[in-house]
């Protein structure tokens, strides 16, 4: 058992690429967590995608032993948290498990938008925040300027910020000393009923679900019968341990400690992040605050390119779900794309990661339909149905427009950091996306803009456009601010007067015409010509808002007539005309798969 005064629980907050995982690697190396030979880049990022993109998706933990200046050995529990907005709830639970945080800022780039969001969460948890200025050995490093920025933007005293270079190992000891001296020890009562917070969980093929816990009060040990208070399930603990970063089995975890437990749980969905774990007998009476069900925000359809891969896709999605309970799916079928799944995600990065893992780990070729958000629709009463409220995930399920009383869509509050010279383009982009500006401040040579935007406009291609107009310099972060009423309509795309379900979308009435025209032009270039004219239309209800026509290929039926009578030619041309009219009525237009994929990738405008 470790004395509470010798425990320090801390997390690392940083924007993508500011050196968070590298700093964690150095701390592990310095405290002897791994030998030189076992050390690899980004030890705590287990997934290939995490390493390649330089992002952290799942929260990871590692226990380090460090002998301080006073000669005592401290137990340091480092939580490596995700930095991206999609995983904001995971971050909030990881932060709630700690008493302090290292704020890592790149000495050359300064404070970025994502750093801010997580710092404010950390401040809400009353954390002691230690600023760490990283990459000080870069030629472009300006530590003094960054210190001033931390003070101006975040309002933290950065006079005693630790200067480090995680890559070359400068200042690592100073970071560890700062953790020991400046971050407070946890509080807890060993004799009280067990109360532990479930910080994260993941699936291990040998152990079942591994659960990361922070013990608040009481003791957790092997053989205990515990219950999850929000989930309501009971389990018998069969292993207790910690990561150093290799798995080490322990007898027990006491108050203030962070470690893992296994209890032969088969699905991650049973172990919900933020839940409270207590004993079945004489357990805690009330759960820890802050638990909430994670709801998917962005939805899209995922279909196999080859219909024969459907079963493989079903198995792969089910396996991914074992490890990621925040991702939901149900079967759907489309006339154009066959069988597939309607999947829900926490945000766009989450969608991209799942899609990439499906294609990479399970070797699947996939088509994803345009992402959409959840709309709340109030329906009027009809002759055979009462007035009611529905949630709409899929544009194909859009109800009869005459019954719709109101439609509400989710809005977000976005914070954008951008260098001055790109400010005009950024403001124009936000206005084009129906944004409402709520603030504009200048920090050094950069502007911080806050906008309220409909999430529907952001999921489409907002992030890519923002990066391209600012040459990659702008950073963006958002939080949800609830639902608001909007003038939204369903736009259907008709090819040869037949609606194509996979291409229908919900858009704001003001943007419908432009979006419809763009889609029709796109399809005109992609669908091959047939022997008859093909109209492509974008329609809202019965009203066509945009139209393009693919002209017919012409077969020269008069080629076999040599000179002679004009009436013979007229007769043949008349016959051809009738045939084409009949074809137009009964002919099927085959839309090639590539046309679908290209039309759905409208982001490349």
From Swiss-Prot:
<dbReference type="Pfam" id="PF14492">
    <property type="entry name" value="EFG_III"/>
</dbReference>
<dbReference type="GO" id="GO:0097216">
    <property type="term" value="F:guanosine tetraphosphate binding"/>
</dbReference>
<keyword id="KW-0378">Hydrolase</keyword>
<dbReference type="GO" id="GO:0043022">
    <property type="term" value="F:ribosome binding"/>
</dbReference>
<keyword id="KW-1003">Cell membrane</keyword>
<dbReference type="InterPro" id="IPR000795">
    <property type="entry name" value="T_Tr_GTP-bd_dom"/>
</dbReference>
<protein>
    <recommendedName>
        <fullName>Elongation factor 4</fullName>
        <ecNumber>3.6.5.n1</ecNumber>
    </recommendedName>
</protein>
<keyword id="KW-0648">Protein biosynthesis</keyword>
<keyword id="KW-0547">Nucleotide-binding</keyword>
<dbReference type="InterPro" id="IPR027417">
    <property type="entry name" value="P-loop_NTPase"/>
</dbReference>
<feature type="binding site">
    <location>
        <begin position="17"/>
        <end position="22"/>
    </location>
    <ligand>
        <name>GTP</name>
    </ligand>
</feature>
<dbReference type="GO" id="GO:0005525">
    <property type="term" value="F:GTP binding"/>
</dbReference>
<dbReference type="GO" id="GO:0003924">
    <property type="term" value="F:GTPase activity"/>
</dbReference>
<feature type="binding site">
    <location>
        <begin position="134"/>
        <end position="137"/>
    </location>
    <ligand>
        <name>GTP</name>
    </ligand>
</feature>
<dbReference type="InterPro" id="IPR004161">
    <property type="entry name" value="EFTu-like_2"/>
</dbReference>
<dbReference type="InterPro" id="IPR041095">
    <property type="entry name" value="EFG_II"/>
</dbReference>
<dbReference type="InterPro" id="IPR000640">
    <property type="entry name" value="EFG_V-like"/>
</dbReference>
<dbReference type="InterPro" id="IPR013842">
    <property type="entry name" value="LepA_CTD"/>
</dbReference>
<dbReference type="InterPro" id="IPR038363">
    <property type="entry name" value="LepA_C_sf"/>
</dbReference>
<dbReference type="InterPro" id="IPR035654">
    <property type="entry name" value="LepA_IV"/>
</dbReference>
<dbReference type="InterPro" id="IPR006297">
    <property type="entry name" value="EF-4"/>
</dbReference>
<dbReference type="InterPro" id="IPR031157">
    <property type="entry name" value="G_TR_CS"/>
</dbReference>
<dbReference type="Pfam" id="PF03144">
    <property type="entry name" value="GTP_EFTU_D2"/>
</dbReference>
<dbReference type="Pfam" id="PF06421">
    <property type="entry name" value="LepA_C"/>
</dbReference>
<dbReference type="GO" id="GO:0045727">
    <property type="term" value="P:positive regulation of translation"/>
</dbReference>
<keyword id="KW-0997">Cell inner membrane</keyword>
<dbReference type="GO" id="GO:0005886">
    <property type="term" value="C:plasma membrane"/>
</dbReference>
<dbReference type="InterPro" id="IPR005225">
    <property type="entry name" value="Small_GTP-bd"/>
</dbReference>
<dbReference type="GO" id="GO:0003746">
    <property type="term" value="F:translation elongation factor activity"/>
</dbReference>
<feature type="domain" description="tr-type G">
    <location>
        <begin position="5"/>
        <end position="187"/>
    </location>
</feature>
<dbReference type="InterPro" id="IPR035647">
    <property type="entry name" value="EFG_III/V"/>
</dbReference>
<keyword id="KW-0342">GTP-binding</keyword>
<keyword id="KW-0472">Membrane</keyword>
<dbReference type="Pfam" id="PF00009">
    <property type="entry name" value="GTP_EFTU"/>
</dbReference>
<comment type="function">
    <text>Required for accurate and efficient protein synthesis under certain stress conditions. May act as a fidelity factor of the translation reaction, by catalyzing a one-codon backward translocation of tRNAs on improperly translocated ribosomes. Back-translocation proceeds from a post-translocation (POST) complex to a pre-translocation (PRE) complex, thus giving elongation factor G a second chance to translocate the tRNAs correctly. Binds to ribosomes in a GTP-dependent manner.</text>
</comment>
<dbReference type="Pfam" id="PF00679">
    <property type="entry name" value="EFG_C"/>
</dbReference>
<comment type="similarity">
    <text>Belongs to the TRAFAC class translation factor GTPase superfamily. Classic translation factor GTPase family. LepA subfamily.</text>
</comment>
């Amino acid at each position: 058992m470790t004395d509470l005064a010798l425990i320090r629980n801390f997390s690392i907050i940083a924007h993508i690429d500011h050196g968070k995982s590298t700093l964690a690697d150095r701390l592990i190396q310095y405290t002897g967590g791994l030998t030189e030979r076992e050390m690899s880049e980004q030890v705590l990022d287990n997934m290939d995608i995490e390493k390649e993109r330089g992002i952290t998706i799942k929260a990871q933990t590692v226990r380090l032993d460090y002998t301080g200046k006073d000669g005592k050995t401290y137990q340091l529990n480092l939580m490596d948290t995700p930095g991206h907005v999609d995983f904001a709830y995971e971050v909030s639970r990881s932060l709630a498990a700690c008493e302090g945080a290292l704020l890592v800022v790149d000495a050359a780039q300064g404070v970025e938008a994502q750093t801010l969001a997580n710092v404010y969460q950390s401040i809400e948890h009353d954390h002691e925040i230690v600023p760490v200025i990283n990459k000080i050995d870069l030629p472009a490093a300006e530590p003094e300027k960054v210190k001033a920025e931390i003070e101006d933007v975040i309002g933290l005293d950065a006079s005693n910020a630790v200067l480090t270079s995680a890559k070359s190992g400068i200042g690592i000891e100073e970071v560890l000393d700062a953790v020991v001296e400046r971050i407070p020890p946890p509080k807890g009562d060993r004799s009280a009923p067990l109360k532990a917070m479930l910080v994260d969980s993941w699936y291990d093929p040998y152990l079942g679900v591994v659960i990361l816990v922070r013990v608040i009060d009481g003791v957790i040990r092997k053989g205990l019968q515990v219950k999850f208070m929000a989930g309501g399930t009971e389990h018998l603990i069969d292993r207790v341990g910690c990561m150093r970063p290799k798995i080490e089995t322990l007898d027990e975890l006491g108050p203030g400690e962070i470690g893992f437990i296994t209890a032969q749980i088969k699905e991650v969905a049973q172990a919900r992040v933020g839940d409270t774990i207590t004993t079945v007998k004489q357990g805690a009476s009330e759960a820890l605050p802050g638990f909430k069900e994670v709801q998917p925000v962005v939805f899209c359809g995922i279909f196999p390119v080859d219909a024969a891969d459907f079963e493989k896709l079903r198995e792969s999605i089910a396996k991914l779900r074992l490890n990621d309970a925040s991702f939901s799916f149900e079967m759907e079928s489309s006339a154009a794309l066959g069988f597939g799944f309607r999947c829900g995600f926490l945000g766009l990065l989450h969608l991209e990661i799942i899609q990439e893992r499906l294609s990479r780990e399970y070797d699947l070729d996939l088509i994803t339909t345009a992402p959409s958000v959840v709309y709340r629709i109030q329906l009027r009463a009809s002759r055979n149905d009462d007035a009611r409220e529905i949630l709409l995930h899929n544009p194909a399920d859009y109800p009869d427009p005459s019954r719709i009383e109101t439609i509400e869509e989710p809005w977000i509050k976005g914070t954008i950091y951008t260098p001055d010279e790109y400010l005009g383009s950024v403001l124009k982009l936000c206005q084009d996306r129906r944004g409402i500006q709520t603030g504009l401040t200048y920090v050094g040579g950069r502007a911080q803009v806050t906008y309220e935007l409909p999430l529907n406009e952001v999921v489409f291609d907002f992030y890519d456009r923002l990066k391209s107009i600012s040459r990659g310099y702008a950073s963006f972060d958002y939080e949800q601010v609830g639902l608001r009423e909007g003038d939204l309509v369903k736009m259907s795309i008709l090819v040869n007067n037949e609606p194509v379900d996979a291409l229908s979308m919900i858009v704001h009435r003001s943007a419908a015409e432009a979006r419809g025209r763009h889609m029709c032009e796109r399809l005109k270039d992609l669908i091959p010509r047939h022997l008859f004219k093909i109209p492509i239309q974008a329609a809202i209800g019965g009203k066509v808002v945009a139209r393009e026509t693919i002209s017919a290929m012409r077969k020269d039926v008069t080629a076999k007539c040599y000179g002679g009578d004009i009436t013979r030619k007229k007769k043949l041309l008349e016959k051809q005309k009738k045939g084409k009219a009949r074809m137009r009525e009964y002919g099927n237009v085959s839309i090639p798969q590539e046309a679908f994929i290209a039309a759905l990738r409208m982001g490349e405008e």
